[in-house]
UniProtKB/Swiss-Prot annotation:
E.C. number(s) listed in UniProt: 2.7.11.1
Role summary: Serine/threonine protein kinase involved in the cytoplasm to vacuole transport (Cvt) and found to be essential in autophagy, where it is required for the formation of autophagosomes. Involved in the clearance of protein aggregates which cannot be efficiently cleared by the proteasome. Required for selective autophagic degradation of the nucleus (nucleophagy) as well as for mitophagy which contributes to regulate mitochondrial quantity and quality by eliminating the mitochondria to a basal level to fulfill cellular energy requirements and preventing excess ROS production.
Protein name: Serine/threonine-protein kinase ATG1
Region annotated Disordered, chain positions: 1-21, 394-561
Cystine connections: none
InterPro entries in alphabetical order: Atg1-like (IPR045269), ATG1-like_MIT2 (IPR048941), Atg1-like_tMIT (IPR022708), Kinase-like_dom_sf (IPR011009), Prot_kinase_dom (IPR000719), Protein_kinase_ATP_BS (IPR017441), Ser/Thr_kinase_AS (IPR008271)
Biased composition (Polar residues): 468-478
Superkingdom of the source species: Eukaryota
Active-site residue numbers: D183 (proton acceptor)
Amino acid sequence: MPDSNAQGSREKESGHHRSHKERIGNYVVGAEIGRGSFATVYKGYRSKTRVPIAIKAVSRQKLTSKLLENLESEINILKVINHRNIVALTDCFKNDTHIYLVMEYCSGSDLSVYIKQRGNIPTLDFVPKAGSSMALLPTNDEGKIYWPHPPTGGLDERVTRSFLGQLAQAIKFLRAQDLMHRDIKPQNLLLQPATETEVAEGHPYGIPVLKVADFGFARILPAAAMAETLCGSPLYMAPEILRYEKYDAKADLWSVGAVLFEMSVGRPPFRANNHVELLRRIEKSNDNIVFPDEKERDSKSSDETSIPVPSDIKALIRALLKRKPNDRMGFDDFFNCGVWDGHMAESTEEESLSLDVSTDSSAGLGESDRIRQMVASTEQSKDRLIPTRAPQPLAADAALNPQPAVPISRDTSEGRSRLSTPPSRPTPTRRSTPKYYVGDATPSEPTAIIPPSPSSAPTPTSAPDPGLTTQQSPTSRANPRPIITAASSAQRRMSGKGDGREASSVEEAAPITPPFTGPSPTMARPSRGINEGSPLAAAPPITMGPDGRLERSSALEGSTSGVGTDYVVVEKQTVEINALADELDQASKRPMIRRSSRGSVVSRPVSSFKPISPNITKNDPTLGAISYSPPFALSSTPPFAMQVPRHASGGNSFPRNPSIPSSLNAFPPTTISASPSYGQDAAARFGVSPGSLQTGALARALTNTAIRLIGTSANTAATAIARATAKRRPNIVRVSDMDAAEDDLLCTVEDLARKAFVLFELADERLLAQTQLAQTARTSSTPTGLTGTTPPFSMQAAAAAQAGSRRKSSSSSMNSEVWILRQQEAAANDAVVLYMKSLAFIVKAMDKVKRYWKNRTDVYDGYVASQELNEMGQWLRARFNETFEKAEWAKTQAGDTLLFPDWLVHDKARDTSRQAAVAELQGDLTTAEQGYETSLWLLQALLDESVYENGSIPDEDKVAYERLMVPIKTRLDALRKKLAESSGMTAR
C-alpha cells in the first residue's frame, strides 16, 4: 500500500483500532494496547493459527546507539530463556526504522490490577469443579466464577502462596543464569489463565499463572527510577538503592518481600511521595514490620476488619524486609523456606473455603524447623524493637543506617529444595498458545540481533543444586517449548572483565551474548512458530539435563555475564547534597538568636546573582510550569522535556499501569536557549522564567510539595526550594548578622557557585547545538512516510520510500551527514565535560558547607543556620540535580574521548566581553555589566587548577588568561561607576 495512505490513515485513526490490517512477517497487527517513550505495543495474532500475540514496535529514531545496543543484547537474552513463569519472546524483526518484538500475550493484566480488582478480571474467571465448595458460589451466565478473595485487605492465602512460589521459580531460574531482575513490582508480574494442559499437570485450578516481565531492562533502571519517583517504582526498591549505594542480587529479595506484603495486606509496606521520604520511613521503622491485624490487637479494637496474616508469611516478610543486605534473608534460605509448599500443585482433598477470612495453612507447616525458628525469632525481636525518630538523611552519617533488630536465625543445613516440582507429577510442558500482555516499559539491555557477537567461556564456581529434578511429561505435544521449572542454584559468575578482578572493583554488568550458531543436527529446535529466517531460529533454548542440571546449548557456550557478581553504582553525591540541604533548612527554623561577631553586611558585589524574575509568590503562575522529567537512563529524550498524556488502551478494561512515563514532546527543551546578542533584553541572555528551569527528579518532587506551602513561612523548606529552583544564580542578600567564619564561607562558596554556573550555561549551549544537529541529521536522513510514532508495518511502503531515498542521495549529501554526526558527537562531548566540571565546583562548594556545618554543630548544640546559608544550600541542591541529570543524558549521546574544551571556554569569554562592550556602547549598561562578569568568571574557572586533569595549569596559559582579564576588569569598574552615578548611589 502507498506509504502516504498508510501514514494518513494512522493520523486519522485514534490509535485504538485500524481500518485495515497490517502485517509483520506472518503476524497480523491489531489494535494499539500501550505506548511508551520509544515503543508502541499492539495486539496481534499469527495469520495462520490466529494465536494472539503482542507486538512491541521500538522506534530506532528514538534510540541512541548505546540504547540500541542494549536492546539488541536484551533480545539475545530473551531468545534463549524458556520458563513457564517468564514471558517469552516469540519472534523479532527489524528494518531501517523500527525493531519489532513479537512476545507472549497475557490476557489477565498484572498483579497490581488483580489486587485492586480483587481478582475480578474478565479473562480470569473459571468453572468451579463439581462437588467442590466453590461450586456453591454464585456464577455468571456462563457458569463461571472468580476466585473468592476477602472483600478487604490482601488476597486469599492460597493465591498468595501460589503466586509467591511461581515468582520464586522465576527468580531462581534467572539467578542460575546470573541474571538479576532489579525491578520486581506488581506491575511487572503479569497474569494469564492456566491452560487445560497446565491444570492437568497439576497447576492449582482457578489460580492464574504468574509471569515475570521486563526482567532484562533493569541494569540501567536504578538511576532511572530515581527520576520515576512519582510513578511508584521506588515503593518496591531496596533501601540500599534509595541510599545510592552499590547493591547486589539481594536487592531483588527486598522487592519480593514488598510484593508479598502487598499481596498479604493489600498495600505496600512503605508509602511516600518521593524516595527521600520513603527512605526515612524505612529507616524509622527500624526493621519493625507491623501488620494491620497486629495494630488492631494492640489497640484492643473491636473492629475486626483486617484479615489475619499467617505467622509463617509474616516471618518471611520480616526476614526479607531487612534494611541492611547482610541481615536480609539469603537466596538459599528463601528458596527453602517452604511457605509455598503444598500450594504449587492441585490438592486432591476437598477444599475448605471461607469467604470472610483466608484459611491459615501455616499450621500444616509445623514440621518445618525453619519456619518455627523464623516465627519464634521474629516474635522475640518484635518485643525488643522500639521505634526511633528518623535521623536526618545524611548518607555519610552512621545514624542513617541504625542497627536492625536481632536477625532471624536460619538453618542452612537443610539441602532439600522446596521449590522443585513434587515428584508425583510431571513437569508441565509449554503450551502451544502463548498469551502475553506487554506493558510500555522499554527495553534497555543488549547486542546485535543478527548475528550476536561471540564472547569468552564461562567459568563455573560451584556445582548446581542436586535437589532439582525434572521429567518430561508423557503428554507433551509435538515439539513443545521446553519448560525449566526451577533453575539450579549454580553460582556461575561470569565477568566480561575477567575473573581475576578485585572484589572491590565495580564493573558494568555484561549481558549474555550468545554467538551465532546454526541449528544443531543432534538437537532439533522446539517449534515456537518461528520463521526460519528469524534471528530467533539461531538460538537454541536452555534445557534441563537428565541429571537435573541445566544444559546450555551452543547458543550459550562461551557466553559471559557479570550480572551475578557485579554491583551497580548510583551517584551517591546526589543524596548527600540533598540531605545536607534539608538539614540546613531544618536548622534555619529553630527559634534561637544567633551569635554575631560583627554587625556589618558583606560588601561583595552580588549583582551577578540577582535573578531577573521576582521572588516566587504563592500566586506565581509560573510555578505550574515546573514539570516532571522522564528517566534519563531509559529514554532518548533529554531529561528536561515535557510529559504528554498517555493514550488509553483500547479493548482492555484493565490496562497495565505504566512503568515508565508516556511519550514525550520534541526538542528544543525550554531550559536550553540560544544565546542572543547583548543588545537584546538582559532577561533573554541572563535570565529565564522560573517555570522553564528544570531541576533533578528529587528537587522537582520536593518543589511540587513546596508549592502548596509557599507563603506559610519565610524560612520553610518549600519557600527555599521553590526559590532556589527559580534562580539561575544564588541570590545572597545579607539580612542578618553573621560571624566572620560564616561570612568567609559564603564568600568562598559564592565564588565556586559563579564558576559552576558559567560552565553550566556554556554546557547548555553545546547541548542545544547537539540537539539541533541531531534534528538536522534526522530530517535529512529520514524518508517521507517513515517519521512519526506509529511504525510503518507495510513492507511495500517502506521499500518504496527507501528506493526514493536512494535515488535522491549523493556522495555530497553523505559527506554532509558524516560531518553532521561528527559535529553532533563533538558537541555532546563538550557538554558532558562542562557539566562534569560544573558539578565538581558544586560538590566542592557543598563540601565546604558540610565541613563548616559539622564543625559548628559539634561546638554549639542546636546551632541555627542563617537564612543566607540556607538559601545557598538550596541553590546548590537545585543546580546539582539539574546539572547531574543533564550530564547523564548528554553522556548517552557522547563518544568515548572526553577532553576539557578549555579553548571553547576561552573563546566564549572573549566573545562575551566583546558583546558586553557593544551593549555598553548602545547604552544597555545592565546587560554590559552582566556580560563582563560572565566573561571574568569564565576566565576565573580556567585559572582554577582543579579543572585540569593533572591538577595544574600551563604557565603560558595562565599568563594569557590573566592578561586578558585586566582590560575586562577595567571596563567593569568603569561601568559600575557609571551605574552608581546614574542611580545616585556611591560607587560600590
